[in-house]
Amino acid sequence: MLETILALLREILHREPSKEERQLFFTLLSSNFPVPPLDDWNTVAGIRLAVLGNPVESRRVDSCLKELSENKALKNVRSTLYVLRLLANQSKAFVLATPHNLLVQDNTQTTMQSAPLTTTKTNKLHGKSKHKSKKSIRSILFKDFDSTSEESDTETSAVEACMARIDQKETSTRLIPNESSGKLSKDTILEHAIVRDLIYAMQGLPGQYFELIKDPTSGISHFVLQRQYQSLSVSQTAATFCERIASCGFFYTRCTELLNAVTKTNMGKTRASLCEALHTGLSEYRQRISLLDSQLTEEQMTLVELTAVANLIREEISTLAVIADNCLYDKSLTSPQILNIIFGYSLHGDRKMHHIGQSLLIKASEPFFDYLKHWIIEGSLLSTEYFIQPTTSNSTDILILQTNNLLVSRSIFINSNWYNKFHISSSPDLKTHPLLSPYVTKLCFEIGRASAFLREDCNNITWRFPESIVALIREANFAKLLSSYSSDASEGTVKLIRSIHMLSSKAVVAIIKRQFLLFDHLNGILYILLGMQGDFIPSLCSILSSTSGGDKYKLSMLEKIEQAMMSCNVSNLPSHVLGCVDVRIDNSKSNFYVTYSIKDPLTSIITPGQIRIYETIFQIQWRLRSADDKLDQIILLTNFFYRRNTQQILTNAGRVGIFRLHYRTLTEEVPLAYTLYVARLSCIRNRTKQLVLALLNYISHDCIAPEYMTLFANLEAAETIKDIIYYHDIAVRTICYKMLISINYHKMADAPLPAPKESSGHHPRQLRSCDIYNGQVMFTDKTISIFSDFHTSLVKICAQIALLHGSVAELFNFQSIFTQDFTMKLQEAANFLDAYVRSFNTELNTMITCLQRCRSIPIPVLDEFDYSHYENLEASLLAVGMHSETHSSHKR
């Protein structure tokens, strides 16, 4: 066993060990030194690095290590590696040398080498001095201040006996020639000097032994041992060990370079706060280096002591350098991206990195939380470097947040001032996730939007949260809103945000319902535009039919509309509702649209696009009511013409003939062709009227009435303006699908309107509700095709009714039915009636087919839809088609 240990020591030193070296080696192997937490190098790795590159020596070392391990001679796995350090501390001079030069020189070693060690007394004195050296090593290296235990006499005697036997075998090779000693002294680096140089390097300053070199490829500087020491006296293992300590200087220099580069450019508040936090971290680093420097001045510090402290310092400064490099090197990073990067480090599994990342995040996020607090309180933006952006004509990054998983259509973007003032950006450069959870982001955004809405749209400039609430917001620790905390809904700051959100929502709903009278305006739309006050449209039809046709102008039409309102039950509505009724004339001045003028803030709920839908519904009912009026006029003309012709026949028969004529003989006097025409006209007129009444009844009782009843019930229970907007929009959408109206009322323009001339391209104008195009597909191509075919057929039927009314009026304009001209006109009217029946049957079949196809169309924008309404209307139309005049065409 003893020979194996000596062989291992020779392989390490590449020479015969001296007596002192052997004794220290044996003492270490037989002692219970505590494991010093200096580094992660183990014994085997250290020994093998010393003989790296020599296959023969490597095999011999492996065999020695194997034998030692099998015999359990090594009590400590790392003991062998620390032999060199023990030898170094014995003389207070640290020799960094290659294996063939490795030696420790003591101040008295030269004298000891020249004097023969032969007497027993000298050996005992030498043993005592080594024992004292051993205690010194314990206290300095391992900080073992309580090491009062002495080596047992048995162990000491055994070691000395072993050393005596070995000394007897030694030859003159133990002694070091004076010539070799002089050469070694030249290449020796004192430990005090190397520690001083390493402290300089840790501050980024090159010294006597370490120099700062910049990598030509990456441009990154790092500390290395100067070349002359690498080639003469320092092994690669020892140089690498020291360069690890000196790398603190590289990390410090890297942080300093990044901070200097950033301060020379324009930077946002987040980047500035991060730089301030990094400066604080570097100041603490410099203070710790100063303490090391003062400790080195007061008492000599060993390299091992410096290593124990430097490893901890290196962890912290390297973490600062990594975070600074990731956040500051790329100048294109936005503030949210920087915060998300730091947030990732704050969630790191390593405690040190987690602590540093969290402290930097708290400091760097201060401007962001100030921005959030100002947005919540004032409803205005301090800057645009974060996720909330003003909506402009160039906004293409509007993020739609789903507010309720059960109501899919809540995520539908609606052209409303509530949505079009501000938006959450969907740009990857501005996203707050994972810094903030989507729930917290939505709450904060909606609170500020409510504040802005109350101040600007509601013209309530003085509106403000109570001072107690404002004080709570300003004093709240918004760092608790970070997604690592806010997952707990009961957390104090999250509960505060939820309470403020509820307060702002109730304030908006109250001012919409009470001050701006939402329900009154919805009733006005219901009774006037949607025709639920059944006598308004007939009254308007009567007034317009009594006046001559021609071009229609806004002022004259307004007078007629006001006259119609005053002559029906609509006049009972409040004056502020009647004052909103308006008229819109198309460019041809032949058609008009009764409309309803909505002002802010109600335009956020009843949007211009939805008003357009109401105008369309009024136009459909106007066509049907006009057609119904024409059908009533046809029966009046028929009855009037019949009475006039009967009177003419009786007059021609004379006073006496009146008593001779009876019904049968009277009908025989009337031409058969005229009788057949009147009979067919009456039949098709009745069936057409049945169709018109079925459509009017369907619109009023199946489409409008149930949806508005549901709407009013939902609005009463609504707690947020988003709920009000949603419920009204769902009512409009449902009516559109029930009435087969395929107008994408969110698309108010093919393209955003150009900016005003006075505004520059760099400052896009603020949008209103009609300026944004919503790319959402409300109706599929199949749906649009079906709905368009249905209304095209409806328009054609109404147009044919008007032509039929004209044909009947021309025929019944004749004074006598016994003239040749009347006979010719009767034939023309009969031919037109045949064409009308064919057209009526065709369009009726088209409408029935459309209703049948509607039962299979998908409706993705509504949570639920009852397709039975289509079946009910189809049954009504089929009843019209079963008449004898239309049955054959229907079968075809």
Swiss-Prot record:
**Which Gene Ontology CC terms are recorded?**
9+2 motile cilium; axoneme; ciliary basal body; gamma-tubulin complex; gamma-tubulin small complex; median body; microtubule; spindle pole
Q: Which Gene3D superfamilies match?
A: Gamma-tubulin complex, C-terminal domain
Gene Ontology MF term list: gamma-tubulin binding
| Entry's Gene Ontology BP terms | cytoplasmic microtubule organization; meiotic cell cycle; microtubule nucleation; mitotic cell cycle; mitotic cytokinetic process; motile cilium assembly; spindle assembly
Q: Where in the cell is it found?
A: Cytoplasm, Cytoskeleton, Flagellum axoneme; Cytoplasm, Cytoskeleton, Flagellum basal body; Cytoplasm, Cytoskeleton
Q: Which InterPro entries match?
A: GCP (IPR007259), GCP_C (IPR040457), GCP_C_sf (IPR042241), GCP_N (IPR041470)
- One Pfam family per UniProt: GCP_C_terminal
Tell me which UniProt keywords the record has, alphabetically.
Answer: Cell projection, Cilium, Cytoplasm, Cytoskeleton, Flagellum, Microtubule
Q: Tell me where it mainly resides.
A: cytoplasm
Keyword Repeat in record: no
Effect of loss of the gene? Knockdown of expression by morpholino results in increased number of cells arrested in cytokinesis, reduced volume of median bodies, increase in disorganized cells impertinent for cytokinesis, and reduced length of the caudal flagella. However, knockdown does not have an effect on the number of cells defective in cytokinesis or abscission.
| The protein's role, per its UniProt record | Component of the gamma-tubulin small complex (gamma-TuSC) involved in microtubule (MT) nucleation for the formation of median bodies and in the biogenesis of flagella. Gamma-TuSC may be required for the correct positioning of EB1 within the trophozoites.
Q: Note the subunit structure.
A: Component of the gamma-tubulin small complex (gamma-TuSC) composed of tubulin gamma chain, gamma-tubulin complex protein 2 (GCP2) and gamma-tubulin complex protein 3 (GCP3). Interacts with tubulin gamma chain.
- Which family, according to the similarity comment? Belongs to the TUBGCP family.
Query: What is the protein name given in its UniProt record?
Result: Gamma-tubulin small complex component GCP3
